[in-house]
Amino acid sequence: MTWDSFGVASRELATSVADSGYEPDIILAIARGGLLAAGALGYALAVKNLYTMNVEFYTGVDERLPVPMILPPVPDLVELRFARVLIVDDVADTGHTLKIVEDFFRGRVKEVRSAVLYEKSHSVVQCQYVWKHTDLWINFPWS
């Protein structure tokens, strides 16, 4: 992925969210991979409330921990119980990172959906908003 294709991807992903009628109250970036995509979607969708969650899973190229771990601090769920949350990451590879974050929010907020630039066929979650499907390793301009 190049910076130019990232711009195209962000705009097209935002259009998918907007066209679906979903209006998130907050956008939650999975750090670090989802930070730039979440910021771009925040601007495109006019959502100013951006949150982050740090999840450790990948330790290197195709090297991961046995299970993903949510690292503190975490968002205040009492504060967000009536919120529609859009979780954003760069890629749903195994999907385990997105799943742990979705599970953290599901049943505790009004609604949770997810958006990614890329989703792989073996992902354990299927995101509502996906720019491209691939099974190749993706080189992002920020990594």
Language-model segment annotations:
Residues 1-143:
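PRPP-associated nucleotide enzymes
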